[in-house]
Curated annotation (Swiss-Prot):
SUPFAM superfamilies tied to this protein: Ribosomal protein S18
Gene3D superfamilies: Ribosomal protein S18 (4.10.640.10)
One GO molecular-function entry: small ribosomal subunit rRNA binding
A Gene Ontology cellular-component term: cytosolic small ribosomal subunit
Subunit structure as annotated in this protein's UniProt entry: Part of the 30S ribosomal subunit. Forms a tight heterodimer with protein bS6.
UniProt family annotation: Belongs to the bacterial ribosomal protein bS18 family.
Pfam family, one: Ribosomal_S18
Protein name in the entry: Small ribosomal subunit protein bS18
Keywords: Ribonucleoprotein, Ribosomal protein, RNA-binding, rRNA-binding
Organism of derivation: Limosilactobacillus reuteri (strain DSM 20016)
Length: 78
């Protein structure tokens, strides 16, 4: 028997930062930054989070600063 393809339109991801009118991404705001980090401690890509290119660059800088300051871990603990 032939398999039926199930498909639908994928919902477009919304930029969380732009949607909530966050103008400045602060490296001390670890609750916000943790939304964009995987369980392993890696920075999630744009295609997963839906952030714009500009906000992704700001996020990356803020996450790296928070790691250096010791606010976020470089890798997850097992």
């Amino acid at each position: 028997m032939a398999q039926q393809r199930r498909g639908g339109r994928r919902r477009r991801k919304v930029d969380f930062i732009a949607a909530n009118h966050i103008e400045y991404i602060d490296y001390k705001d670890t609750d916000l930054l943790r939304r964009f980090i995987s369980e392993r401690g890696k920075i999630l890509p744009r295609r997963v989070t839906g952030t714009s290119a500009k906000n992704q660059r700001k996020l990356t800088i803020a996450i790296k600063r928070a790691r250096i300051m010791g606010l976020l871990p470089f890798v997850a603990e097992d």
